[in-house]
């Protein structure tokens, strides 16, 4: 028995990305907030959903082997079509390694992008908010963030212009040679629109207009960078050189002629021969990938070390689970014995109770603290055999708390019966 392997093997991932299903098809696989909320009720286990413009990934922790199939069944139902066959299923260390690669920016449309770290944080926040992200999913996501930060600190993978939004601006520059003096429109004032506005500002672009459905949000973003702003109105877009679109719209819109439209939506809103989408940015990303290959190799080495660190995280989880479970039993027994002592003494006064409470707590601390210190050292030194022995001996040989109570009650009953027979 290896408790760490047991934890590792309980992780899995359901993965859809621009690489595995394509950008166009990916657009029809996204989950809305209400659908994720419903999924959290449907699934009995820990889970986090990571969704970006180029991936939809569901990370699971469950000792139930059928959990992945349950999720896939739900995905088919909620999309009213079979999408389970498009999924890549990763299990155990393979799922963990994949998340570390994603967090490191080496499995991305734009190698080395920073945005993914925030997106993983958001996935963890949402998971906790929905009550489906407890200690195991949190441990996985937190370690992935540490690996991602270390990769960026110790390699040059994120040096220079990285990220889908930077790629979009670079793509526009490749079409015109320069964007200074060009008339530019940004559709959308959300996270993507905000990133584009910042990048364009840093590039020195000044003739930029923000279009947004919510007028106030568009105005606030425009004021921040000294840009113009209007409510979203497709009829106003004919005089622009470049349009960056970062919106969802239920209908397709014909792109204005003579304008370069870079549509980062999934699915894209605009159509026409002058429209460029995430699919087109992939080609630019491939060139970047070749340039960063040496940094990717260094990142992979850090990821391998991250996997070893995560095994230590799992050992700490074993320790915490053991201490929590064991001490809850000890505390229950302590309380029972205090009550029994008070009955024997025939004194339920506050002072007597306080003395017994303090004495029993002190005894427990003095008896078990050295043992837990040794167990902690065993965890730090990865001494699996010692940990297995301790957890087996000190958790009633693996018998559940309910079963322990049942045995205890039976023994007490037998003891009373035996006493009655002697008296007669």
Curated annotation (Swiss-Prot):
Positions contributing to substrate binding: 52-55, 108, 113-115, 119
Alphabetical UniProt keywords: NADP, Oxidoreductase, Porphyrin biosynthesis
Biased composition range(s): Basic and acidic residues: 402-424
Domain of life, per lineage: Archaea
Function recorded in the entry: Catalyzes the NADPH-dependent reduction of glutamyl-tRNA(Glu) to glutamate 1-semialdehyde (GSA).
Domain notes: Possesses an unusual extended V-shaped dimeric structure with each monomer consisting of three distinct domains arranged along a curved 'spinal' alpha-helix. The N-terminal catalytic domain specifically recognizes the glutamate moiety of the substrate. The second domain is the NADPH-binding domain, and the third C-terminal domain is responsible for dimerization.
Anything else known: During catalysis, the active site Cys acts as a nucleophile attacking the alpha-carbonyl group of tRNA-bound glutamate with the formation of a thioester intermediate between enzyme and glutamate, and the concomitant release of tRNA(Glu). The thioester intermediate is finally reduced by direct hydride transfer from NADPH, to form the product GSA.
Listed name of the protein: Glutamyl-tRNA reductase
Organism phylogeny: Archaea, Thermoproteota, Thermoprotei, Sulfolobales, Sulfolobaceae
């Amino acid at each position: 028995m290896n408790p760490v392997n047991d934890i590792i093997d309980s992780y899995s991932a359901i993965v859809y990305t621009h690489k595995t299903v394509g950008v166009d098809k990916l657009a029809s696989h996204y989950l809305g907030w209400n659908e994720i909320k419903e999924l959290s009720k449907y699934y009995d286990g820990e889970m986090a959903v990571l969704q970006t413009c180029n991936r939809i990934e569901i990370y699971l922790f469950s000792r139930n082997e059928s959990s992945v199939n349950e999720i896939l069944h739900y995905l088919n139902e909620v999309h009213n079509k079979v999408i389970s066959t498009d999924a890549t299923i990763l299990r155990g260390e393979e799922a963990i390694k994949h998340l570390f690669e994603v967090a490191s920016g080496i499995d991305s449309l734009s190698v080395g992008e920073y945005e993914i770290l925030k997106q993983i944080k958001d996935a963890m926040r949402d998971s906790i908010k929905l009550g489906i992200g407890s200690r195991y999913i949190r441990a996985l996501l937190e370690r992935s963030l540490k690996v991602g930060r270390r990769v960026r600190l110790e390699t040059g993978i994120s040096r220079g212009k990285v990220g889908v939004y930077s790629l979009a601006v670079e793509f526009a520059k490749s079409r015109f040679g320069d964007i200074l003096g060009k008339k530019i429109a940004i559709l959308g004032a959300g996270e993507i629109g905000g990133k584009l506005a910042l990048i364009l500002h840093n590039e020195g672009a000044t003739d930029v207009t923000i279009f947004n459905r919510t007028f106030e949000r568009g105005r606030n973003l425009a004021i921040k960078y000294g840009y113009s702003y209007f409510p979203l109105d497709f009829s106003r877009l004919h005089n622009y050189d470049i349009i960056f679109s970062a919106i969802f719209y239920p209908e397709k819109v014909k792109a204005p002629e003579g304008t370069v439209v870079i549509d980062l939506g999934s699915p894209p809103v605009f159509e026409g021969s002058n429209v460029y989408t995430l699919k087109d940015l992939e080609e630019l990303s491939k060139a970047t990938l070749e340039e960063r290959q040496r940094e990717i190799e260094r990142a992979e080495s850090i990821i391998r070390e991250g996997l070893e660190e995560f095994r230590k995280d799992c050992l700490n989880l074993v320790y915490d689970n053991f201490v929590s479970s064991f001490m809850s039993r000890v505390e229950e027994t302590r309380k029972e014995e205090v009550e029994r002592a008070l009955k024997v003494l025939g004194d339920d006064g506050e002072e007597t109770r306080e003395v017994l409470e303090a004495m029993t707590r002190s005894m427990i601390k003095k008896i078990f603290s050295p043992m837990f210190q040794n167990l902690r050292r065993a965890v730090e030194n990865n001494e699996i055999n010692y940990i297995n022995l301790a957890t087996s001996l000190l958790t009633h040989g693996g018998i559940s708390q309910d079963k322990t109570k049942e045995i205890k009650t039976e023994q007490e009953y037998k003891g009373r019966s035996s006493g009655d027979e002697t008296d007669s």
